Amino acid sequence: MGTDWEVKEVTGIASALLGTADIVADPAGLAADFTRMMETAMGKEVADVALRLWTPVGTTVKFVKQVAPTVEELTGRRTEAGPRAGDYPTGSWGDESRDYHVCVEVPAANLGQEMLAARVSLVIPEPGGTVQSLGAQGLVRAVWTDDMAASTSINPQVAHYTGQAELAQVIQQGLDLRKAGDIDGATAKLGRAVQLAGASGNADTAKLLAKVVDVVDAAAGTVRLKAKVEEADEMTLETRSTKTVRVKK
């Protein structure tokens, strides 16, 4: 509540607990915010859910991250779960959906070959090494081809969430550079953020950015840093920078 706190400390705690953080800049909004928070907490029905990733011999996991509704890096939080499998914590779930981005590297093979590169499922690890399956499973397929169009085109969902992850990163970098007095660096990073927010349809983040920069050309990422920025506006942008929007249907 208010602005007498460090954003990175609070968001770091929220990330460690697989939760979320937000700001209540105006104390008048505390009651409504607390009500929403309690409704969300009471709506959580399943606790300690893990994303289990199995990969065959020779396959390397490059990264695992949540990309919606917020960006959350999970790669370094893996716990081994048997031969070729690992669990990545996702916390408690209610009636909701989340999107994850998994990247694996497979060994070389001949043209026309196909293999199962990974199997993803949602489970609840239990004492004694047993596990409760939640019935959700996805298969990652790798195919070797010389079709340049197929091998070089990026899946629209992957492209979208790669942009959303970059958006969160450049906002953080831009605000850090602004605090450090690097005007040119901050302008470049926040300009890129405006460009990404506009391209992905992230209107909420675009509005928050507009309180920190004057937008000259959103499509080109041309902006000017505002001479005076309210501390609450800057903290709100930083706190909510990891919130994403889903791919447009």
What are these regions (language model features)?
Residues M1, D26-G29, G135, S151:
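General structural signal for secondary-structure boundaries
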Residues V104-K249:
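Long, acidic serine/threonine- and proline-rich intrinsically disordered regions
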Residues T3-P127:
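Acidic, polar loop-rich interaction surfaces within structured domains
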